[in-house]
């Protein structure tokens, strides 16, 4: 059961035992759609398949968002500057996939960033995405320098869509190198799009762009019908599965 009368501005209150979401098109002008529920794997998969994602602070209830416009990126259109290409070609960094998910998400939560006070990746979020990784739906890319983890990213994969969640670096360009490695993997495996979610200057420089939410939802509806690459992407054990969204 979904209830909207308890909250202002038509923000929906999610029931604990029902995983349905209201249409993403019903979100407020700033993108907030619903409040409550939980971070169970079932609810998260339904959310991402519906163009919705959780984003909240430790001292807040779970908040669910669907932004308009939506930032996306095609893996084939990643922009690599000459200096970054030189860094990649130098092989001073090495990359892997799904070899250290727990550490990547913990670093994303803990590494300080400019113009950001605290983190939205709270302990419950960390636990939830670790479980999604165990189930084969959440994935990480790791960047190493002299065997030290210095950058990385993580996100959720459904159909031919990769939903990027967060990235970090402790050494210049390490997260960009991770993004390049991700795009190479996605291209090889015929992924169509990366859901960047929020419009940021950093990702615009990397080749991302915004589209109206209604257009994003149309693309998403098509792309999630494709088989999902479920499992560990790094050890060759992942298999293509048709994920049925109930």
Q: Model regions: which residues?
A:
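N-acyltransferase acceptor-side catalytic subdomain
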Residues: 1-246
């Amino acid at each position: 059961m979904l209830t909207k009368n308890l909250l202002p501005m038509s923000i929906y209150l999610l029931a604990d035992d029902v995983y349905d979401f209201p249409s993403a098109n019903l979100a407020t002008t700033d993108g907030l759609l619903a409040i409550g529920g939980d971070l169970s794997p079932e609810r998260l998969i339904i959310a991402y398949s519906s163009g919705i994602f959780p984003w909240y602070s430790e001292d807040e209830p779970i908040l669910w968002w669907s932004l308009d416009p939506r930032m996306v990126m095609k893996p084939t259109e990643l922009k690599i500057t000459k200096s970054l290409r030189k860094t990649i070609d130098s092989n001073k960094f090495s990359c892997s996939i799904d070899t250290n998910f727990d550490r990547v998400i913990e670093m994303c939560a803990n590494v300080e960033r400019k113009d950001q006070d605290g983190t939205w990746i709270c302990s419950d979020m960390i636990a939830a995405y670790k479980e999604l990784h165990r189930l084969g739906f959440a994935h990480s890319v790791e960047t190493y320098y002299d065997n030290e983890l210095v950058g990385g990213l993580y996100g959720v994969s459904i159909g031919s869509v990769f939903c990027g969640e967060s990235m970090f670096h402790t050494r210049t360009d390490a997260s960009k190198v991770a993004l390049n490695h991700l795009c190479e993997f996605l291209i090889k495996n015929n992924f169509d799009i990366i859901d960047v979610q929020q419009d940021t200057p950093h990702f615009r420089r990397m080749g991302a762009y915004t589209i109206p939410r209604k257009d994003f939802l149309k693309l998403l509806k098509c792309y999630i019908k494709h088989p999902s690459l479920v499992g560990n992407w790094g050890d060759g054990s992942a298999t293509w599965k048709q994920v049925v969204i109930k």
